[in-house]
Structure formats: structure tokens, C-alpha cells
Amino acid sequence: MTIMYHDGNRRLQDQFDSRRISDRLEEKLTRTAFTADDRAFIESAIYFFIATADADGRPDCSFKGGAPGFVRVTAPDELAFPDYDGNGMFKSLGNLAVNAHVGMLFIDLHEKPGRLRVNGVATVTREDPLLAATVGAQLIVRVTARGTAVATAVTSALGDTSAICG
């Protein structure tokens, strides 16, 4: 098992002879800390998608949005965002309460098209200093990127997806 791949990934990579390119992509795409470009991309985002799963592994994918800067990089390997009551179902945050693993996908389709993935472990709290500085938020979510590959990122033209679709 590696930062990006588990046994299931590896079996399919071997079956379709893509292990070498997969290893190269992992080498090129994983980081031990957010770069200045990662930070600028994240903090300029007006939305992102968040993937969570409940304790039984049932997945959920949600949209989170706000003004630029609503997501902040708070440490070399951490970001934080406020949660606003949308529909009151608490699907994502409820899942995080029982399974802290999270995937986030930031996409910019405008001036400089690109995307950035962050996989990590989240905490959800009402006892965070950012809450007082965030009007209307109920909770703060902090995500610590996982392992030594803190951020898994790609910022390239959307048309260039041949090797980075997974």
C-alpha cells in the first residue's frame, strides 16, 4: 500500500499494465505540504466538492460554497472551512462524526482552469477560534492531509486529463 494506492488499485494497475505510470504520477502529484500555488488555488475557490462515508462505508458527495477565502490553509498540512446550515441534514458532517476520512476536490473552470485534490482526516467543532470570525457559520471543519502525501494536486488545463483522471 502506498499513499495513493491500495491492493485493489494495484491489482487493476497490474492487469492493465499501468503500475509504472501510476507510480510516476504518485511521485509527481503528491506533496508533503501545501505549496504557495496550492494555497492560492484553495483560498481563491468559491466552491469545492467533499466526499465522506458513514461508519458502514455508505458514501456521500456534497457541494460546499462561499466567497473566495472561505476555505483557508491554516498550516502546512491543514485547511479549514466553515459550515453553514444548508438543508439541516448534516450529511457530510454527520458522516465525519463517525468516519473522519474525507476527500475534497477543488475545481476552477474559469480564468485558470485546474483542479486540486486533498485527502485527509477531518475534525468538526464548535470550539474553534475561526468560528467567531466567520459570520453565520455553525461549525468549523479542519482537515489534516493524510500521511506524508499531504496534498494530492493537479493544476492543469482541463483538456489534459489523460493521465490524471483517477
Identify the role of each PLM range.
Residues M1-G166:
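Binding-site signature for planar aromatic cofactors or substrates
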